[in-house]
Amino acid sequence: MRTLRVAGAAFAVALTVAAAGCGGGGSSTPTTGPEIYKAYCSTCHGVDGQGGVGPELGGGVVAQKYPNIDDQIAVVTNGKGTMPSWRGRLTPDQIRKVVVYERTKLPG
């Protein structure tokens, strides 16, 4: 029974982090793919895209999962599963820049 409570608490913490958007964003608005990733994505997906609360994105993994860039943009924009929607929090230009960064430069 105790194991079930601990697992439930861990799940609740994970959902809270996901609902909070997996990142903060400082006082200045990030404009480049790496800046946007660091500010909004790295908390869940890891500094180098190695994964954590969210799945691994680096090393080409995300491009394999979403061969069509527009499919990945749709997930970031609208959310999917535990991935929160970034519509209204990031501009379409910021979303495109961070997706391109994740697909091409993120080490993994």
Indicate residue ranges for each PLM-predicted region:
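Axial heme c-ligation environment in periplasmic c-type cytochrome domains
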Residues: 52-60, 77-108
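The canonical Cys-X-X-Cys-His
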Residues: 36-47, 98, 102
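A generic local structural motif
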Residues: 2-4, 28-30, 44
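Bacterial N-terminal signal peptides that target proteins for export
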Residues: 1-11
